Amino acid sequence: MHHPKETLLIDSSNPSYSHLTEYRFDNLKREESRSTSLFGDRRRVMKILSGFSLIIIVVFIFATSHEQALSTTGDLTSSTQSTTHGGVVFTYPTTRKSPGKGCVLNSQRSTPKNLKQYTGNISDACLAGIKSSNCKTWLMTNAVILKYSDDVVSNCPSILEFVNKTSLSCSGKSQIQYMYPQSDSASSDCNHSYDFNSNALNRAIYNFNYSKTLISTSYANTPGFAMYTFLLKIMNCVNKNGIKLDAGILNIFTDMTYIDLCESDVFMSSFPDTLNKLIEAGYIVKFYFLNQNLQDTQKNVENVLAGCKYMNSRSYCEIVDWSYHSENPNEFEICIPDSQPSGKKEDFNWHVTELLLIIGIPCISLTICCIAFFVCCLKCAKLKMAMMRMNVFSNDTHQNPDEMELKKRWIGMRKKFNKDVENGSCKELNTQKWSHFASANNYMDIQALANANKKDIWEIDTKNLLVQEDHLLGNGAFANVYKGIVKGKIPLLVVNNSLNMTVESENNGHYEAAIKKLPAHADEQNHLDFFHEIDFMKRLGHHPHVISMLGCVSNPYEPLIVVEYCARGDLLKFLRRHKDYVLMNKTDDCPIEADMCLRIKDLVSIAWQVADGMSYLASKNFIHRDLAARNILLTKSLTAKVSDFGLCRYMDSALYTAKGGRLPIKWMSVEALKLYEFSTKTDVWSFGVLLFEIFSMGDVPYPTIQQVDMLEHLLAGGRLSQPLKCPNEIFNIMQKCWAEKPEDRPEFNEMRGEITVMLNLDDESYGYLSVESQGGPKYTQLTMQDSKETAPCSTPGGSQDMDEDGDYDSGSEGHSQGTCAQLDQVLTERFGEEQKKEIKQIFCEITSKSMRGKRRQSNSTVSTYQS
């Protein structure tokens, strides 16, 4: 919100604008923009493509070198003592505790009897990370047993993520199951196996209970025995169900140390036999020790887990460091149907790869260049086709007869439109005739549209326009409004040469203006909508209570709309700023700190002006769709002007149906919320909400109702309550506006007439109006919702005397003529010649009807008396 004191003052006839040079649109720095020719920057395009190709080469070489390094690492053995493995540096702590008293490691501990040995032939077994056509369907059993509750929250999500990564290739024919030490029943986990990619699996993962993964508190001091019972449970499950698919893998995730396992004699004695049975059942087993580095203690770990190999993926039981899996997920992947191994490439041939690099990179670069060239040609072809369709945008003098005919139609319709605007007779404007010239057409190019408007009479030369980008008047989602100055005669007065308009902000041929422009992030659709708004403002015409466009700049990259400057900003902020400065009585004094104070009469006057502006829009068959206090602007003299026509549409039928977009929910009627149907009657509903905003001094409508509940609230009969400062007569109009059926709502010209009657044109006292009624010259008043006592006031024109009955007499019939004469003078001084006639006609008709009614009543009384 801007303040009147911030207005730029121009004292001299030729003011200096040197301090605003950076805001000029004719500034060379701002005029420079990227060339529209896609072939003008061939060198730059080629440099970009060359750099892109170079990046691809570097990345490819790095990836290949990394893969070669991994392939030459070979199988890991238990004798490796290095602190790194496969290029991965381990950062986890070695163990959580030192060896206990009950742990005795026997270096001569042998592997279990009859344990299968991998022979090197890939057809003998289904292993993780190996592609095989015989290993398409898998049963993945994930056993999670954790000891430390502090790490459960971090360990469980990482386990789920690992399982997801290693089973991406599994189809719905493969199955997965989870097993925990604390299950609801002994066989519950065993009976729950889920197909991959099923809703049941998704629900199971969503309902994953971390607490089930912890060992029982009774096993807190004997974690090795807990592992024994857990493996026994898994083995019983295997004996019960078996593996009916091509292969099976058992992933055991634990944060126990090998020392915890070693301290349990039961585990140490039973593990070899348990492992042998699991392998004979068709499982390959992998132990994942979470948050541990077993590099330095791999011999001890292999001794505890007899038959398992440390970091050897080609064994039936593998001991895995948890830190290694994230760097090499392919080595643990299952359900790979091809015959080629994915984890480690056999017989890697660097010379073949080098040859592929030499041949492939140039081919890829050439392909990219061809695609870029094709895209450039396609865009240029589309641009030429658009310009051929709209031949009026071409400066070529050699045109065929069809092109000349289309150009003549364009020029003829433009001249007719300008002539109708000058004569004020453009009410019957048919937008369908302008359909292939309108800026909202999707096929029109923005550049061509801008070229069409360059020689338009509404255009402002950028040399005569200064934009103060450091003086932001307002901003929204799709546009920013800045203060600016227009030099010379404004296009609005050129188009409407008969318009005798006085601009408040004019000073020696320089006009203060509000300049609307698109933000930097605006896309092509925003530009098209902006040009649509420019076209709408041209067709809108001039009205004292509707914001007028002074001119425009049809720059395709930075179009501008120049409108009237309203010093007091939007009505909503104005009301909230003066919320505490409303004088309820004539004798009240305005506080010293207030820049101005308002009376109820001022609020009624603003409401009348908005109704007048909306009546004009309705007469032009325009629907606003966003009538609210935030979109009403106030000039320095408190003249209200309807603005913001971004959602405004031309109504060529009884209803306009919206197709989407952002809409003001709490200002919308029932049919607009329910069916997205808009008409003048929906604007009437919004006008009722606007009246609530005015007389509540800027309160938010329906503050306790959510937007999604608005339709239900309105259908249930919910409406806004009467504001404290709202007269009963105004609230009656508001209630009429909120009728559920559109046909029951009043027209804007009807409401304008009612508010005209309410306006006190002769008395500045608060709350009292002088009007004529059908029953004779009586005195009515604006009554507040909590007022009990009222007082009369004088009627415009003439003097009144109180008769014996306490009624006011307005005099003879000749007094009506005196009233209209005085009313004529007051209207001319207050509202100008343009609005005088309509208001005068309303008052005179009311006076004439009341006098005729009085005569009929008098004659009827005399006849009754005589009879």
Swiss-Prot record:
Enzyme class, broadest EC rank: transferase
Alphabetized InterPro entries for the sequence: Kinase-like_dom_sf, Prot_kinase_dom, RTK, Ser-Thr/Tyr_kinase_cat_dom, Tyr_kinase_AS, Tyr_kinase_cat_dom
Gene Ontology terms describing biological process: cell surface receptor protein tyrosine kinase signaling pathway
Subcellular location: Membrane
Chain positions covered by the region annotation Disordered: 782-821, 848-867
One Pfam family hit: PK_Tyr_Ser-Thr
Entry-linked CDD domains: PTKc
Glycan-linked positions: 395, 423, 496, 500, 585, 859
Single Gene Ontology MF annotation: ATP binding
Compositionally biased region (Acidic residues): 801-810
Bilayer-spanning residue ranges: 45-65, 355-375
Protein EC: 2.7.10.1
Binding site for ATP: 473-481, 516
Reaction(s) the record says it catalyses: L-tyrosyl-[protein] + ATP = O-phospho-L-tyrosyl-[protein] + ADP + H(+)
Membrane topology: Multi-pass membrane protein
Similarity section: Belongs to the protein kinase superfamily. Tyr protein kinase family.
Protein name: Putative tyrosine-protein kinase F09A5.2
Native species: Caenorhabditis elegans
Upper classification of the organism: Eukaryota, Metazoa, Ecdysozoa, Nematoda, Chromadorea
